[in-house]
Curated annotation (Swiss-Prot):
Positions bound to Zn(2+) 1: 104, 113, 119, 123
Localisation: Cytoplasm
Protein name stated in the entry: RNA-binding protein pos-1
Protein's job: RNA-binding protein that coordinates cell fate specification and differentiation during early embryogenesis. Binds to a consensus pos-1 recognition element (PRE) consisting of the sequence 5'-UA(U 2-3)RGD(N 1-3)G-3', where R is any purine, D is A, G, or U, and N is any base. The PRE motif is found within the 3' untranslated region of many maternal transcripts required for early development. Binds to the 3' untranslated region (UTR) of Notch receptor homolog glp-1, thereby repressing glp-1 translation in the posterior blastomeres in the embryo.
Gene: pos-1
Organism: Caenorhabditis elegans
Biased composition (Polar residues): 61-74
GO CC term, one of those recorded: P granule
Region of interest (Disordered), residue spans: 56-82
Length: 264
């Protein structure tokens, strides 16, 4: 019984010694491998390979946690910023609203643009977009409502810049405007010129007082020529007198009437 206990105790001691020796050998082997130049080089190469990814990830986290100054400025309330920053905010918003809302002049001339895809203007009608706050000709209601001043008096001080439709709807007003130059020549030269220009657009003997001319009556002859050139895209530089222009308008009006009668 005692011999068996002694053998068992000796076996346990041997087993413990083997475990300790194995652990010591493993520790020495591990320390030797970690201290070897090859292992150091492998570890260094591994860290260098992953360094760009770690740097990129860090930059991504920083950009996500810290927005750019333009983004933070655009998201701020205009009522809570100083005047200079508010002006910068409005400038950025106007720039963003105007993006691709007009055709590129360089692209229209030569079908090429040095800015390429970075151009703020549209390279073709397919790229055009409506602005966020349309004004002028871009407004959806541009030239959709009659101009009260022009409809009643046949004249408008805004001229071709008027945002409303210039259409004669009152026959009495048209007669008054067409004959005003004979009655008020000594009282108001400006009104006389306006009435005379109006008679150019309303040919004598015409009973159609509702024709849509879609533009006003310039007072000066040069304005009249430019307005007609813009509307028709024709060269009217050869017409040096108002009488020649009146004759030309008369012939154009008759031609339009003939075309409309053929269609009906």
């Amino acid at each position: 019984m005692a011999d068996n206990d002694f053998l068992s105790g000796e076996a346990i001691m041997v087993f413990k010694k083997e475990i300790l020796d194995s652990h010591s050998d493993f520790t020495r082997s591990l320390s030797h491998q970690s201290a070897s130049p090859e292992a150091y080089d492998q570890e260094n190469v591994f860290s260098q390979d992953f360094q760009p990814f770690m740097k990129q990830d860090k930059e991504t986290q920083n950009s996500a946690s810290q927005p750019t100054s333009e983004q933070s400025l655009a998201n701020r309330d205009p009522c809570t910023v100083p005047d200079d920053l508010r002006e910068e905010m409005m400038r950025q918003r106007r720039k963003e609203d105007a993006f691709k809302t007009a055709l590129c002049d360089a692209y229209k001339r030569s079908q090429a643009c040095s800015y390429g895809d970075q151009c703020r203007f549209a390279h073709g009608v397919h790229e055009l977009r409506l602005p966020m706050n349309p004004r002028g000709r871009n407004h959806p209601k541009y030239k959709t409502v009659l101009c009260d001043k022009f409809s009643m008096t046949g004249n408008c001080k805004y001229g071709t810049r008027c945002q409303f439709i210039h259409k004669i709807v009152d026959g009495n007003a048209a007669k008054l405007a067409s004959g005003a130059h004979a009655n008020t020549s000594s009282k108001s030269p400006a009104r006389n010129a306006a009435a005379h220009n109006h008679s150019l657009f309303v040919p004598q003997g015409s009973t159609d007082r509702s024709m849509d001319l879609n533009q006003s009556l310039p007072i000066r002859q040069s304005d009249l020529v430019r307005a007609f050139a813009r509307a028709t895209r024709l060269d009217v530089s050869g017409y040096n007198s108002t009488a020649q222009l009146a004759q030309y308008f008369e012939s154009q009006f008759q031609r339009i009437q003939q075309l409309s009668s053929h269609h009906h």
